[in-house]
Regions:
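Phosphate-binding glycine-rich loops and adjacent basic patches that engage nucleotide phosphates
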Residues: 20-30, 41-48, 109-111, 126-136, ...
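Short, hydrophobic/π-rich interface segment
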Residues: 126-186
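Beta-rich nucleic-acid/ligand-interaction surfaces
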Residues: 186-194
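N-terminal, charged low-complexity regulatory/assembly segments
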Residues: 1-67
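Short coil/loop linkers at secondary-structure junctions
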Residues: 28, 72-75, 157, 177
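Amphipathic interaction/junction segments at domain boundaries or subunit interfaces
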Residues: 57, 61-63, 67-153
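Short beta-strand-to-coil "C-cap" segments at the C-terminal boundary of structured domains/repeats
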Residues: 195-199
Length: 199
């Protein structure tokens, strides 16, 4: 994958979050994670959707965590989750449920979904956006997932399902409700995200 400042920044960001979490758990030497992440990035197929670049980089970093740390996927997931929860920058970047679910953003979302179907990057996400209805305020159907793709490319498709859990954590931090009944990572035909304001 081509190098970019944003991709480099996201890699450094995830490492800065996880490093103190590893230290808390008595894992002192994790320098190899950075090296392995760089190796994965070099091999990675293109993913040129700026909205989901951080997720793609996170997928690579999670693979590196599992190859180097000596901990289980569940333990590494907890390290990543705890690091994100404790990050003021991450929480600020998420914003509020009210802002996220604002219908004024729908036009841009429809354009984003249409653009995703052009599959400009081999490991891009592909999705549909669903408008507000009686059951939810915003829906997404994802038919292809960049995290699933990079995990499959790296020979560890079983790791993708752990990162799916972060979607619920992020919704909770925004004070939004997320309902999802199936995921690509667990073999479904698509992921069905349904967001609502907590009432």
């Amino acid at each position: 994958m081509k190098k970019s400042f944003k991709a480099w920044f996201y890699g450094k960001f995830f490492h800065s979050l996880c490093k103190p979490q590893y230290k808390k758990r008595g894992v002192s030497d994790i320098s190899g994670i950075i090296k392995e992440h760089k190796n994965i990035y070099t091999r990675a197929k293109e993913m040129n959707d700026e909205k989901l670049l951080s997720s793609y980089i996170m997928g690579m970093y999670f693979i590196a965590m599992n190859r180097v740390s000596g901990l289980s996927p569940e333990e590494n997931y907890r390290i990543l989750e705890d690091g994100l929860k404790e990050s003021a920058m991450f929480r600020k970047g998420l914003g509020t449920a009210e802002a996220y679910l604002d219908e004024k953003r729908m036009a841009a979302r429809y354009e984003w979904a249409a653009e995703s179907k052009k599959r400009k990057g081999e490991n891009n996400w592909v999705l549909d956006v669903l408008p507000k209805c009686s059951e939810y305020d915003l829906g997404y159907d994802y038919y292809e997932c960049g995290i699933c793709k990079i995990c499959k490319d790296e020979g560890c498709p079983e790791l993708a399902k752990y990162l799916c859990k972060l979607d619920f954590m992020m919704a909770d931090l925004m004070n939004a409700k997320l309902v999802r009944t199936k995921t690509l990572a667990e073999g479904a035909d698509y992921c069905d995200f349904r967001y609502s304001l907590k009432r």
